């Protein structure tokens, strides 16, 4: 039995979230009656409202009065008034991943998982399949610039989704094709141990059907080890590793883009295909790897080399993934979602390879628990930044942890040899700190998953006003 086509209103609690908004948008496009609420009036809420979806700002019990079904994200607490009301009314309450899984049953599906790179890789897979006239439905964890949204309804047989592993619910997703970009210690508050995380990814791959396949990055040692523990499923490996089935070769990172070639070697004797002079208009070795994963899927699904080449060259990127917000005095300013040490290091490495000037990092640490559990990694992931400006921790609802804060991170950076790590007391002080350091050709990179994105977009104007 599949999700009935005729349901009463489906109410999303937290509809403005990046994952929830995409599901809501696709369901509305499928003809379901969709509504929802969010604590804040954000861009996603406004976009859904403009598309005819009824939205409420603020959570109130009366918002679910006419609902037949309620969808919740993991961010919604048990004491939410709408959730309490839904349960008092005995309404079905569905987790976000469960509803995504229901949508996936309508299509053949590619699910993109991994600690880092999911959103960009999902966007790249969607772009390449679109170029191959497969017209996929897409539900992503970020705004795809070419679409202006994180979701689109396609008429083709394929769906491409970002598989969020943070609460383990990605194991509910019925994928035909699975991508694993990397596996690092993250979300330990849910999983309890790194071994539990690795086991979850193994089960994610085991879930694909015998006629499907997994695309896995063997440059990452944990993923390479996982490949050795997968039985009875088809695996396509990718990476710079000489043993990879889809091998990334000769990366040239200059001028804010990546040039490379890819060699595809099937396990069939004698099969070999080389794609020369590929161009991706994004900097960074990590993005070239993401493109290689997408290329592996597209090639397997029959997309031509010419379509792949043109789609990569025309890729418009993803919002909050090394997004240029403006410039001042010849220095470029960027916004990036990176908030894990591995992500931060990759972004700063990409920035370093793209400019002859200095790299100035502005970071807003996200969650006390993350800073605590990965403290040593945070203290060493800024090596490619000439200056690190550290803001107070964005708590995301957490209580402070003694000895884990902005100042302890600055002390840790300096203790490990960083030459210029400074504190940001207030967002209003950022322009002054940057203006005293930024010169022509420098990159100012704002990093974090909290409110720092607002600072990144405001900074060019604030610098201009300061100069005046």
UniProtKB/Swiss-Prot annotation:
Top-level class of the enzyme under EC nomenclature: ligase
Involved pathway(s): Cell wall biogenesis; peptidoglycan biosynthesis
EC number: 6.3.2.8
GO molecular function, one term: ATP binding
Catalytically driven reaction(s): UDP-N-acetyl-alpha-D-muramate + L-alanine + ATP = UDP-N-acetyl-alpha-D-muramoyl-L-alanine + ADP + phosphate + H(+)
GO biological-process terms attached to the record: cell division; cell wall organization; peptidoglycan biosynthetic process; regulation of cell shape
Signal peptide: none
Residues bound to ATP: 114-120
InterPro entries for this protein: Mur-like_cat_sf, Mur_ligase_C, Mur_ligase_C_dom_sf, Mur_ligase_cen, Mur_ligase_N, MurCDEF_pg_biosynth, UDP-N-AcMur_Ala_ligase_MurC
Annotated localization: Cytoplasm
Any GO CC annotation of this UniProt entry: cytoplasm
Predominant localisation class: cytoplasm
NCBIfam families: murC
Family: Belongs to the MurCDEF family.
Function field: Cell wall formation.
Descriptive protein name: UDP-N-acetylmuramate--L-alanine ligase
Organism: Methylorubrum populi (strain ATCC BAA-705 / NCIMB 13946 / BJ001) (Methylobacterium populi)
